[in-house]
Amino acid sequence: MGGPAAPRGAGRLRALLLALVVAGIPAGAYNLDPQRPVHFQGPADSFFGYAVLEHFHDNTRWVLVGAPKADSKYSPSVKSPGAVFKCRVHTNPDRRCTELDMARGKNRGTSCGKTCREDRDDEWMGVSLARQPKADGRVLACAHRWKNIYYEADHILPHGFCYIIPSNLQAKGRTLIPCYEEYKKKYGEEHGSCQAGIAGFFTEELVVMGAPGSFYWAGTIKVLNLTDNTYLKLNDEVIMNRRYTYLGYAVTAGHFSHPSTIDVVGGAPQDKGIGKVYIFRADRRSGTLIKIFQASGKKMGSYFGSSLCAVDLNGDGLSDLLVGAPMFSEIRDEGQVTVYINRGNGALEEQLALTGDGAYNAHFGESIASLDDLDNDGFPDVAIGAPKEDDFAGAVYIYHGDAGGIVPQYSMKLSGQKINPVLRMFGQSISGGIDMDGNGYPDVTVGAFMSDSVVLLRARPVITVDVSIFLPGSINITAPQCHDGQQPVNCLNVTTCFSFHGKHVPGEIGLNYVLMADVAKKEKGQMPRVYFVLLGETMGQVTEKLQLTYMEETCRHYVAHVKRRVQDVISPIVFEAAYSLSEHVTGEEERELPPLTPVLRWKKGQKIAQKNQTVFERNCRSEDCAADLQLQGKLLLSSMDEKTLYLALGAVKNISLNISISNLGDDAYDANVSFNVSRELFFINMWQKEEMGISCELLESDFLKCSVGFPFMRSKSKYEFSVIFDTSHLSGEEEVLSFIVTAQSGNTERSESLHDNTLVLMVPLMHEVDTSITGIMSPTSFVYGESVDAANFIQLDDLECHFQPINITLQVYNTGPSTLPGSSVSISFPNRLSSGGAEMFHVQEMVVGQEKGNCSFQKNPTPCIIPQEQENIFHTIFAFFTKSGRKVLDCEKPGISCLTAHCNFSALAKEESRTIDIYMLLNTEILKKDSSSVIQFMSRAKVKVDPALRVVEIAHGNPEEVTVVFEALHNLEPRGYVVGWIIAISLLVGILIFLLLAVLLWKMGFFRRRYKEIIEAEKNRKENEDSWDWVQKNQ
C-alpha cells in the first residue's frame, strides 16, 4: 500500500521549507506591506501629518494632510495659519503635495459677521480632517485656534473655524463658525472660548465638531444637520456645569441605538480626572442631543476619551466603540484602549482592554481609526497608534474584528523606525477604509508630524487555502494490514487535498507544506506513534511543494505505519498539514505602484495549519467503555524483620513495593501504575515473576510510570510485579517515607469505582544509632599540701590561691548504622567538699571538636576562696595525728554538690566521633582544710539522644555513660610552727613520764638497796662453792 512519494530534493531545501512553514506568518508581515511604502514629505516644521485623510473623487485617489503650523501661500500676510495639502497617489512620481486653496480672507480683521472679525494667525488649520462617507463625499477641515477679535479691546474669542471642502477639492466650500453668536463677547462664558473643530467627524447628514472650551472648558459638541441646516444643541445641565472636563476633545458617530439611526459620541478626558465618554441620541424633533450612555476611565490622568472610534466589529449592524486612554500608566504612559461591544439599544458592554506591547511612554491609543475590511474576512478592522513608542519613532497596531467583537492579539505591528528611520511620531494620525491603489483592498495612511511625513501603506491580496486531511475512522490495532520488512504492522492511508480562493488573487500559486503525524505527542515532547513510509524510507513528516490553480483541488496520498508496542491507544492520532506560500513572481512592475505579492490569511495568531485525527478501535461491553481498576500493595524492607515498624536510615539499602493490579471492567487501554516517591529515592528495577508486558519508565526523579499490558489490559485480568528503590541516599529530613501509587487508564472509570485506584504506603524514617562515650583525665592525680612547691600550681591574676589545672577529654562515637542528627552530653563534677563548702572548680573553657557543637556551664563567680578558720594549735596538732585515709566525692551519692555542664552536638555521621575538651582549675586552698589524706573525684558524662529527632538507640549496645576519676593526695607534712610545738610537747611529755616512773619505782622500793648484806651473802656463797669443790677433788 502506498501513495506517490514527495519530491526528494536536498535535505537542505526540505529544512528550509519546514522552517518557512512552521514559522507561520509573523505579526509584522500580514497584508499591509511595510517594504514598499508610499512616502509624502511636507514643509519643514509645519507639523505636516498631524491629521491625515484618505479621499477619492471619481477615479482619483488623494491623501489629504493637515499641517497646522504651515505658512499658507494663499495667505502670505497671515502668520503660520496652517494648511491642508492634497497628495495624488497615482501619476505622481515625485510624491509632490500641493496646498488646497480655501478662498480664505488674507488680512487680519476680515469681517465674518455683525460682531465678528477674524484673526487667522496660528489658527492651526488642518488640526482635524474628516470625510463624508459616500462616493462624492465632501471633506471637513478645521482650525480650532481661529479667533474672533471684534471685541479685542476686552476679549479675544477663540471660537474655532471649520471648512467644508467639495469632493473635487477645487470649488469654493462652506465656512462654519459653530460657536459664533452675535453680541456675545465674554471669554469663557457659553461658547466664547469653545475652540470648535479640535476634533471633527462627518456622516452623510451630520457634521460633528468638538468644542472643548465652551462653558469654562466643560466643553460641548456642535452638530450641524446638513439636511435642514440647523445645529443640534446639548442642553444637559449636569454635563454643561462640570467645568474643565473638555467634552468634545474627541468626537465620532455611529449606529448605537439602531442600524438606521445616527448617534453622536463625545470624549471628556478631564472629567473627574479619570475621563468619560458620552453617547448622545440626535433627536431631530427637539433639535437636541440626549445622553443615552456613559462610561468612565479607571485611572487618574489617563486621558480616557481623548480618542474615539465607532466601528461595527462583529458585523451585527450596530456600532461598537473603542475609547483611547493614551496616558494610562502602569509604569509611565504606556496607554490603553477599551473596547465596548454594543448589545443593542445603545447598551454597551466592556469587552476588554488593548495595550499593544505595553511599551514605556508609547501613548498607545493616541489615535484610533476604522480601516474597513482590511483582509476581506467579512469584519471591519482597526488601527491604533502609539506615536511615542521607540523613543518617539512611533508604531501602529492592527487589530481585527470578528463575530465575538475584536481579536485580542494584534495581527501586525508597523514600526516607524523600520519603515523609515527618519519618521517621528509615526501613528499620531491614521486614516483608512479606501482602496488607494486599486487592488480591491483598503489601504492605510499614517502621519508622522514631527518629521513632517506621511506614509501610505498598501494592503496585499489575501489568499485563503482550503486544506482537507482524509483519514480512516479508526485503526484496528489487533489486525495489522501492512508489513514492515517481514513484520506485520498496523497502517493507515492519509490523503491531503489543497485548493485556494480569494479576492483579486493570482490564478496560480506555489504552496509549501509539511504533513506531520501524531503532532499532539510531538508538542508534548513525546515520541510519535506513527511514521510515514515513502519509497522504503521512514520519516516522521512529509515536506512537499505544490503548484495550485485557482479554485481547483490538488491531492496527495501517503501511507503511515503504526509503531510496534504502542502504549497509548486512547488518545487520538492527530495529523497536521502546515503550509506557506512559495515565492511569488508578480510580473512586470509599474513604476509608481508595483503590484504586491499575496499573503495567506491570518488565523488570529494561531499556526497556519489544518488538523484531523483518527483513533484506535476498542472492544468494550459497556457504552462508556469503563474500566474498573483495583490496586493493592505492600512494602517490603530488605534484611529486616517484618515486625520492624520503621525504616532505619543507613541500615536498609533498598525497599520493594509489591503491587497487584486487577481490572474488573472493560478492557483498559493505556493502563498504567504511577508512583509518586521521594526525590531521595533512586529507582533500581522492576521485577515480575514472568513476562507479562509490564515496563517502567522514570519520567521525573520522583515520578515512575509503569505500563501494564499491551496493547491493553484485558477485562478480568490481574498483574503482579515489584518495583525496587535504593534507599541509601535518604537524608532523613522527612519524617515518613511515603509512596502514592495510582492506577489509571485511558478509559473512563465510574466515580463509584475510583476509591481503590489509589494506594498510599508509608513507613516512618528513624535514625538508629549506637552511641558510646569515653574519657581521659590529665593529670590522674596530684599532690597538695603546705610543703608542696608552689611552682607546681598556677595562680590567676591578682589572686592568692594556688590552682591545680585539670583537663578532661571526652569522646562521643556513633557506631551507626544511621547518622545521629543531634545529641547532647551532660557532665557533672563534684564541686564542694561538703554541702555548705566553697566551690572548688573554676571551668575556664569547653571546646567541641571541629566546632560542631556548643557547651554551656555556670562559671564560678569567685574562683579564689581561702577558707578562714580560728587557729587552734591543739586542734591543728590533733587533726594532724588523726587524718583519715580516703574521701570519695561522687555525684551519684546523696548530699554531694556538683557542677553540671551541657554540650549539644550537630549531626554525627556513622562511624564518626566528636570530642569535648574541658579545661578547669581546682582550688587547692580548699583541699588543704580537709582532713583526708586522699580525695578521689569521680566525674561522670552521659550522652543522650533526642527522641523528637526520631532517634532510636540500639538496645544492649555500647555504654552511653563514662566515669572519669582523679585523686588529690595530701603530702602529710605539718606546718613549721606545728613541728616546733610537737617537739616541745614531746619533751615535756617524756619528762613527765620519766618522773612518773621514778616515783613509781621509789614507791616500790626500787631505790632502797642493801649493799652490805648482798656483798656478804655473795662472799659466803663463793666460799661455800670453793669448799665444795675441794671436797670433791679430794675424794
From Swiss-Prot:
The listed location of motif GFFKR motif is 1005-1009
Which residues bind Ca(2+) 1 per the record? D312, N314, D316, D320
> Gene3D superfamilies under this entry?
Bicelle-embedded integrin alpha(iib) transmembrane segment (1.20.5.930), Integrin alpha, N-terminal (2.130.10.130), Integrin domains. Chain A, domain 2 (2.60.40.1460), ntegrin, alpha v. Chain A, domain 3 (2.60.40.1510), ntegrin, alpha v. Chain A, domain 4 (2.60.40.1530)
Q: Spell out where the chain crosses the membrane.
A: 982-1002
**Which PROSITE patterns is this protein grouped with?**
FG_GAP (PS51470), INTEGRIN_ALPHA (PS00242)
- Give the signal sequence positions: 1-29
Sugar-bearing residue positions: N225, N476, N493, N612, N654, N658, N672, N676, N807, N854, N904
The residues the record assigns to binding Ca(2+) 2 are D373, D375, D377, D381
Q: Which GO terms describe its cellular component?
A: basal plasma membrane; external side of plasma membrane; integrin alpha9-beta1 complex; integrin complex; plasma membrane
Entry membrane topology: Single-pass type I membrane protein
Query: Residues on the Cytoplasmic side?
Result: 1003-1035
Q: Which residues lie on this side of the membrane: Extracellular?
A: 30-981
Something else known: Expression is increased in small cell lung cancers (SCLC).
Database matches in PANTHER family:
INTEGRIN ALPHA (PTHR23220), INTEGRIN ALPHA-9 (PTHR23220:SF69)
Query: What is the designated name of this protein?
Result: Integrin alpha-9
Whichever gene encodes this chain, its name is: ITGA9
